[in-house]
């Protein structure tokens, strides 16, 4: 039993049942409502999240109806998007017929191709859907004043100060208290609500308890919410502060990941309920009580009108047909890969992240020469670490957010003595303190006026250089406080040690286990090349609050630099190789692992720790660098069209300039377009132009005797890929709810998120400019197509074992197909652990 259940059950002693509503019902409804909210990671590591994560126990169609009723959300593109696809021939009659046959939607729904096409081309708009009512909605209707937006703004203003992570110079005096206690303490002094006409706020604060859980129970009792509508009502309230609720859900996710608890989301729900009670006390006698009594039964009936259900079904069928059209094109390309070559030792094996942006670069690299083999693997390369920068005591988790770091790796300075490192740390700390003090002087509410006059003009040179992209407006956090010489020599230290009382580094046994696991997961256990390149990835942008969203999601929203440098040092260690040999993994003496970083904005490759590469491989390295440079030019040329770059001008210069342009709202397209995840040997896709839309994971099932690697793929990278895909999907089909709006209007709040403008809810998801070029969608909304070359019984067993995987597949949140040894699709997963031939 969790703490929330224990505390709520304790109320049985002091609280009578709410008519037919029991405390158990409140516990269950509160938990379900909170579980419906997907987490939102802060900007410092903005990883992609499936915005429908709390709804995967529903079918896609049922979730669409639920969200339409609870917050007027869309889960499909506008109808004319599909109509245009039909008109252009992209969606065929066969696609429409297949969608109707597969979806099996209940009536009312278009039941024939003719009916579905008639619906697609109809000029009638979709019927309006009225969300479930709240007291704020009713008060808005009755009084003509938008109390719903007022409440959202009020909570958002408070939350921005309370959750601030260091942006504000005047911290909330109650920041150390739990959220609900802090809000009550501030509300006791704040008269904004009364000044705006919510005179019932003081009464609500007096009548409602001082703990969040008791407040939820008491408020539900006062408003007399029916049990069958309680979850819907509480979920609806959380959706009115969706962004802040999502951030609170992240705090809970993070706490639970490390074995703890967090009740901030419950506190936010209680705060929102206090506003409901306050509005009730303020306007009940002005018609709100009567209006609430009339509309409250809607909470127990979430059924849409018949015309709305027909429109929703039609849109879902059109979406399915659109996905069918992509499947048809993708399947036609697969099976046309270059014939597999006779196994022989390659000059270079280059492992990249499975990220869709790597597909373009990998294909370009393979085009430059036939003696390079590329490999796809999650960008943390099997090394889940917390990387602690120099002079810090804590670092970021360099692994997927589904995992916790297993090792703490500290940063050191290569070649420096202990005393020298101590002096470097002291200098960095001093520079950081001075910079912080200077920044406080610049931006503090009082001193900023004295700063602008005498000092402001001195910034003219920097302003010009920043504008021209010659300098960065803000130093990169990883380099801040370090001089140029030191930056060139910082590196991970693997030897066991301590930071405070925390052990750091890895023992030999731990290094061997991690190395073996990584190599097996990459299907790289023999036939090693002379150079094995491990290329993590990151991005280079300026003036971009969501910059970490362009970095590596598998590295927790960081670049993959730390992971590849750690991996390479371990894999080049003779002691590790000796132990690996005992496990049957023999790495030749002339094989050298090399760490690199792929800049996805510029398609440049940076190679790290060149001084550690033996002289015997100098020519190999020089040739590899030439190959990487040539591949970068090819990749930039391919991406130029989508970036609307003038192909007659210098493409390379223009692409690199975008990464330095602080006015550029689209420095790169990120993972826009992502639509497929393929786990198979590279031979199955080699030479096939997949347009940078496919996650490519190398996997050879014949080397996976117990299918543990397959299980890892289907429960980690496949899930992460679906999160990315559905984040882009949600941000495209309903940017109002699941995206972050217009990037040019963003204001960073508390360094943790953005507002669109100066008020409103915290925004989630991606900016509109990340999915749309101003004229057309760049990201085509479609659910992820997973294609795996593995025995069907093995995949079925994994689906049956893991509930989340089964929910995603059985409820239609992603598609799964089986490949044969030619790369041809043979079967599709049909739900309920059944497969059908394709």
UniProtKB/Swiss-Prot annotation:
The cross-references to InterPro entries, in alphabetical order and at most eight, read:
DabA
Any one annotated GO CC term? plasma membrane
Superkingdom of origin organism: Bacteria
Which GO molecular function terms does the record list?
zinc ion binding
Which coenzymes or cofactors are required? Zn(2+)
Presence of the UniProt keyword Phosphoprotein in the record: no
Q: Where does the record say this protein resides? A: Cell membrane
Q: Which residues bind Zn(2+)?
A: 353, 355, 537, 552
Q: What is the predominant subcellular site recorded for this chain? A: membrane
List the keywords (alphabetical). Cell membrane, Membrane, Metal-binding, Transport, Zinc
Question: What kind of membrane protein is this, topologically?
Answer: Peripheral membrane protein
| Oligomer status and interactors | Forms a complex with DabB.
Give the family from UniProt.
Belongs to the inorganic carbon transporter (TC 9.A.2) DabA family.
Tell me the HAMAP family matching this sequence. Answer: DabA
Q: What task does this protein carry out? A: Part of an energy-coupled inorganic carbon pump.
What protein is this chain from?
Probable inorganic carbon transporter subunit DabA
Q: Which organism is it from?
A: Chloroflexus aurantiacus (strain ATCC 29366 / DSM 635 / J-10-fl)
Starting at the broadest rank, the lineage of the source organism is:
Bacteria, Bacillati, Chloroflexota, Chloroflexia, Chloroflexales
Protein's gene: dabA
């Amino acid at each position: 039993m969790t703490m929330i259940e224990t505390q709520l059950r304790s109320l049985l002693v002091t609280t009578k049942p709410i008519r037919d509503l029991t405390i158990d019902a409140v516990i269950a409804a509160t938990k379900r409502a909170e579980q419906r909210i997907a987490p939102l990671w802060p900007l410092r590591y903005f990883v992609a999240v499936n915005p429908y994560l709390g709804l995967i126990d529903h079918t896609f169609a049922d979730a669409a109806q639920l969200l339409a009723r609870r917050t007027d959300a869309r889960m499909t593109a506008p109808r004319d998007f599909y109509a245009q696809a039909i008109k252009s021939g992209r969606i065929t009659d066969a696609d429409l017929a297949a969608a109707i046959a597969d979806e099996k939607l209940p009536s009312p729904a278009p039941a024939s191709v003719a009916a579905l096409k008639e619906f697609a081309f109809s000029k009638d708009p979709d019927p309006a859907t009225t969300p479930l009512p709240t007291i704020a909605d009713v008060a808005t209707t009755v009084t003509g004043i938008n109390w719903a937006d007022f409440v959202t703004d009020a909570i958002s203003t408070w939350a921005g100060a309370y959750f601030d992570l260091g942006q504000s110079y005047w911290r909330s005096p109650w920041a150390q208290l739990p959220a609900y206690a802090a809000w009550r303490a501030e509300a006791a002094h704040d008269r904004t609500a009364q000044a705006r006409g919510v005179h019932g706020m003081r009464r609500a604060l007096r009548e409602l308890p001082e703990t969040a859980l008791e407040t939820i129970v008491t408020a539900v009792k006062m408003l007399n919410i029916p049990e069958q509508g309680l979850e819907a009502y509480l979920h609806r309230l959380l959706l009115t502060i969706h962004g802040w609720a999502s951030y609170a859900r992240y705090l809970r996710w993070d706490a639970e990941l490390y074995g703890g608890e967090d009740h901030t989301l419950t506190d936010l729900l209680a705060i929102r309920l206090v506003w409901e009670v306050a509005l009730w006390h303020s306007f009940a006698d002005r018609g709100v009580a009567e209006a609430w009594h009339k509309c409250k039964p809607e909470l127990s009936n979430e059924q849409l009108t018949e015309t709305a259900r027909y429109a929703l079904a039609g849109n879902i069928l059109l979406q399915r047909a659109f996905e069918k059209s992509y499947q048809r094109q993708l399947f036609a390309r697969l099976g046309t890969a270059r014939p597999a070559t006779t196994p022989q030792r390659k000059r270079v094996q280059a492992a990249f992240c499975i990220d869709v942006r790597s597909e373009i670069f990998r294909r370009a690299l393979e085009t430059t020469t036939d003696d390079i083999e590329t490999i796809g693997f999650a960008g943390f390369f099997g090394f889940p670490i917390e990387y602690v920068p120099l002079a810090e005591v804590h670092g970021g988790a360099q692994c997927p957010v589904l995992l916790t770091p297993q090792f703490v790796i500290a940063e050191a300075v290569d070649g420096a003595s202990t005393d020298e490192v101590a002096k470097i740390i002291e200098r960095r700390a001093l520079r950081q303190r001075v910079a912080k003090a200077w920044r406080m002087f610049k931006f503090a509410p009082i001193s900023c006026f004295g700063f602008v006059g005498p000092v402001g003009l001195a910034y003219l040179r920097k302003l010009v250089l920043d504008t021209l992209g010659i300098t960065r407006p803000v130093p990169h956090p990883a380099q801040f406080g370090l001089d140029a010489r030191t930056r060139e020599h910082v590196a991970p230290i693997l030897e066991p040690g301590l930071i405070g009382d925390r052990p750091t580094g890895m023992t030999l046994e731990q290094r061997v286990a991690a190395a073996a696991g990584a190599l097996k997961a990459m299907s790289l256990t023999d036939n090693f090349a002379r150079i094995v390149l491990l290329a993590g990835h990151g991005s280079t942008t300026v003036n971009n609050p969501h910059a970490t969203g362009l970095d590596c999601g598998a590295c927790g929203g960081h670049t993959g630099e730390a992971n590849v440098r750690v991996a390479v040092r371990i894999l080049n260690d003779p002691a590790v190789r000796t132990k690996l040999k005992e496990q049957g993994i023999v790495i030749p003496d002339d094989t050298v692992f090399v760490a690199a970083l792929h800049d996805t904005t510029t398609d440049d490759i940076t190679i790290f720790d060149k001084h550690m590469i033996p002289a015997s491989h100098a020519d190999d390295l020089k040739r590899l660098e030439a190959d990487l440079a040539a591949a970068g030019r090819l990749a930039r040329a391919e991406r130029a069209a989508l970036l609307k770059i003038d192909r007659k001008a210098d493409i390379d210069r223009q692409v690199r300039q975008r990464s330095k342009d602080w006015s550029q709202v689209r420095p790169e397209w990120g993972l826009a377009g992502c639509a497929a995840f393929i786990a198979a040997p590279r031979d199955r896709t080699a030479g096939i132009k997949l347009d940078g839309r496919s996650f490519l994971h190398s996997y050879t099932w014949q080397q996976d005797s117990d299918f543990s690697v397959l299980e890892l793929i289907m429960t980690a990278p496949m899930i992460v890929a679906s999160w990315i895909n559905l984040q882009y999907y949600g941000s495209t089909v309903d940017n109002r709810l699941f995206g972050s709006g217009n990037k040019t209007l963003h204001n960073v709040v508390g360094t943790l998120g953005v507002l669109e403008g100066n008020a409103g809810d915290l925004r989630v998801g991606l900016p509109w400019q990340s999915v749309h070029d101003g004229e057309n969608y760049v990201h085509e909304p479609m659910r992820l197509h997973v294609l795996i070359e593995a025995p069907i019984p093995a995949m079925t067993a994994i689906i049956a074992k893991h509930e989340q995987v089964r929910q995603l597949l059985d409820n239609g949140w992603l598609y799964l197909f089986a490949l044969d040894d030619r790369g041809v699709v043979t079967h599709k997963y049909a739900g309920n652990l059944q497969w059908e031939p394709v």
